[in-house]
Amino acid sequence: MSSRTIMAFDFGTKSIGSAIGQEITGTASPLKAFKAQDGTPNWDDIEKQIKEWNPDLIVVGLPTDLHGKELDTITPRAKKFANRLHGRFGKQVELHDERLSTAEARADLFEFGGYKALSKGNIDCQSAVVILESWFENQWG
């Protein structure tokens, strides 16, 4: 098992959550939520985080419906965000199914902090944690 550092993003048109994890432990921690204008973040802020953590790989959540079918409105935008991450920073980027990640993130946050923990930024970052930990589980089969 390698010890790569993996960063994850939960793409949204208004907010993009992020998380960081270690492949060797299969666990992730929330980082920060980036405000976005119609899906476009402040790339300087993203760059600072990528330089600080220097991930070996970036995982971006791929929005789909409950059957795994891509959504016409948001899925292409998440793919574009992933392509831009690769193009701007030269990092390997993988897409990962994010079905039900927001619901799971809300449940996790509520369990530990009640309603006060359910801010938009917290939910987006916890969703990135769920996406990354799901990606780890898929790697181990």
Swiss-Prot record:
Keyword check for Kinase: no
GO BP terms in the entry: rRNA 5'-end processing
GO CC term, one of those recorded: cytosol
Subcellular location: Cytoplasm
Keywords assigned by UniProt, alphabetized: Cytoplasm, Hydrolase, Nuclease, Ribosome biogenesis
UniProt superkingdom: Bacteria
EC number: 3.1.-.-
InterPro entries: RNaseH-like_sf, YqgF, YqgF/RNaseH-like_dom, YqgF/RNaseH-like_dom_sf
Gene Ontology MF terms in the entry: nuclease activity
HAMAP family attached to this UniProt entry: Nuclease_YqgF (MF_00651)
Family note: Belongs to the YqgF nuclease family.
NCBIfam families, A to Z: RNAse_H_YqgF
Name of this chain's protein: Putative pre-16S rRNA nuclease
Annotated organism of origin: Aliivibrio fischeri (strain ATCC 700601 / ES114)
